[in-house]
Amino acid sequence: MILPNKTILAVHWFAGWILIGTFCGCSGDSAPGGNPTAGKSDSSQKTITVGLLPKKKGISFFTSCAEGAQEAADDLGNVELVYDGPTEGEPSKAAELVSQWALQGFDVIAVSADDAQIMGAAMKKAQDKGVLTISWDSDVPADSRSFFVNQATPQQIGFKLVDVLAEEIGKSGEVAIVSSSQTSNNQNMWIMHMKERLKDYPDMKVVAIEYPGEDQDRCLETGRTLLKAYPDLKGIWAISTVALPGVAEAIRQSGKSGEVSVTGVCTPTPMKSYVEDGTVKSIVLWDTRDLGYLTIQTAAALARGLIKPGDKTLKAGRLGEREIVGDNVMLGDILIFTKENIDKYNF
């Protein structure tokens, strides 16, 4: 089960008494978490504690990732998963949580970073305390983690987003981008590659890039503002999982469903009504449960010394063998949700 922080404190207190018993001549394994020998394969049977930190709790994307993460922990059988994070998308509070977990002696901390620099600094401090660190969904500087669990390359995502909207609007017209925060590494990388891909569509003109943060109400208001400011707007990319439902609602309320296209990234369940009424034709994503699942498989393999820099593949439970490209553990294929297939997915 996913444990709250107070439970983990109790687990580590108990582990400390076991360690004392070992020094007194009793047999037993060394206490888990936060020690310099973490990652050796001779500890493959001990329970490891993994902290999974999203950009923001309460968003369907990250809730689905957490469900997949718990599935992986259950499959592995000796992983205690702690899922927690800020409720307002505040990087400083996320960094504080990383520090708390490091002090509690977690074995691995896995972070989706809303601010790569702030989170990277916190993860380096955790490393100094003997904690193994990885990132997932949104990366941090490479020197502050061992691996990045990557849903797809930023180029693949950026190119796909552009191609989908270009097809919907006839490859011409005014378009806008609604992202999350200006410090969000994954969205910034997608935008960079979107601009690159847009060179293939010279008749599409980006008139605005907005950053309302991880707040759906603010995304709704941003959508309304764009529709008023740019009456000739043909399409919008809403590239966070709160931006897409927010902007879609703005288009629906304005009566412009079918007139202004919107696509982006979101889990399918919150978007079904918008797809069914034609406000949204296509959604670009990946299986978020699988992303959470792969993150915990990666964390466990790292803690047990089963992967190391330079490896090319990872055995990842029900996902089979996953490719490692450099220090990126790759999830795989991008999914496109449409009216024809969205009811097949329930996350």
Q: Could you tell me what each predicted segment is?
A:
Residues M1-I8:
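N-terminal secretory signal peptides that target proteins for export/translocation
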Residues A10-G25:
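Bacterial N-terminal signal peptides
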Residues C24-F347:
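A residue-level marker of the well-folded mature domains of exported/periplasmic proteins
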Residues T7, G16, P54-K55:
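Short linear sequence motifs
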